[in-house]
């Protein structure tokens, strides 16, 4: 497959940031946007799912990286990098936690940075987002237009459920039935409480990213904790930059240290999640937290 999937010039070794939703990947992408060599693209899900939109979940493996699909993805990212006048791609899409094997097949030399955050913090933040409805109305039209423009017409119907649910949530002011990465089996959770759904979602997504990443060479995948990034931004970013084989950037470091969130927010869930909620989510979060090195 490697021979068939020859990569184009500026996407030879893209930097792909993976991390579950509400893990700090948007902020980290804004940090790397300060690097003069990088063209950063946030959440072009429709590029990664091109040709695979009828899948029942967001999981893609090397078997899904058919030559014409891989070629389209590389060409689309190549055009983006060139349009920005940069030399290298930096990309982040939360559902790519479930596509690491696919990414490695499309970009064999990709540098995959996995940003891991405590599942309780993710749960706390995602709960707020699920209630809020996310996008401002004026952004919905442009997002849907961009998505459909980048999708083959025969795959347009595959996007309808997500469009319908988003519009319904906005019009009725009711929470979305589901939001974020869709691991295998996600449909089976919908009859359960939103707390259980969010807990299972984080555990399944984080564990698959860790498992798939650990099967790659250490030169292709590296995992970093969000908590370390916040407490020691310079040290953690230096390690990321070295792993990605980027040149140093004072502008990047200055932006990170001036915009980093207060350390006090990292365990905010302790004050905001009551005992009942903690008891509900613990059976679903604790095994994954323990496996990933967190204490309950």
Task: For each feature predicted by the language model, list its residue ranges.
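PAPS-dependent sulfotransferases, especially Golgi type II membrane carbohydrate sulfotransferases
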Residues: 1-16, 135-138, 150-296
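PAPS-dependent sulfotransferase catalytic core
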Residues: 1-84, 129-156, 259
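Short beta-strand segments
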Residues: 17-19, 89-92, 114, 223-226
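Conserved beta-strand scaffold positions in the cores of enzyme catalytic domains, especially
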Residues: 40, 112, 221-223
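Glycine-rich phosphate-binding loop used to anchor ATP phosphates in small-molecule kinases
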Residues: 78-99
């Amino acid at each position: 497959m490697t021979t068939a999937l020859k990569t184009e010039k500026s996407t030879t070794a893209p930097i792909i940031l993976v991390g579950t939703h509400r893990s700090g990947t948007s902020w980290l992408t804004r940090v790397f946007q300060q690097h003069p060599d990088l063209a950063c693209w946030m959440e072009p899900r429709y590029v990664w799912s091109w040709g695979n939109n009828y899948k029942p979940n967001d999981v893609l493996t090397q078997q899904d990286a058919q030559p014409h699909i891989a070629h389209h993805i590389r060409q689309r990212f190549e055009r983006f990098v060139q349009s920005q006048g940069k030399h290298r791609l930096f990309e982040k899409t939360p559902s790519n936690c479930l596509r690491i094997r696919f990414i490695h097949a499309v970009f064999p030399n990709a540098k995959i940075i996995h940003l891991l955050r405590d599942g309780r913090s993710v749960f706390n933040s995602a709960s707020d987002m699920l209630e809020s409805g996310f996008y401002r109305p004026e952004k919905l039209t442009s997002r849907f237009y961009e998505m459909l423009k980048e999708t083959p017409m025969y795959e347009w119907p595959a996007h309808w459920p997500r469009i319908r649910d988003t519009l319904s949530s906005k019009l009725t002011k009711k929470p979305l039935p589901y939001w974020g990465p869709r691991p295998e089996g996600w449909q089976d959770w919908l009859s359960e409480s939103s707390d259980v759904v969010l807990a299972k979602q984080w555990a399944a997504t984080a564990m698959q990213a860790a498992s798939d990443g650990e099967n790659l060479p250490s030169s292709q995948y590296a995992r970093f904790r969000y908590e370390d990034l916040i407490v020691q931004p310079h040290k953690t970013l230096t390690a990321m930059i070295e792993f990605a084989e980027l040149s140093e950037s004072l502008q990047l470091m200055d932006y990170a240290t001036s915009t980093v969130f207060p350390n006090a927010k990292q365990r905010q869930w302790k004050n905001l999640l009551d005992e009942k909620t903690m008891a509900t989510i613990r059976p679903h979060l604790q095994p994954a937290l323990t496996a990933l090195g967190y204490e309950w």
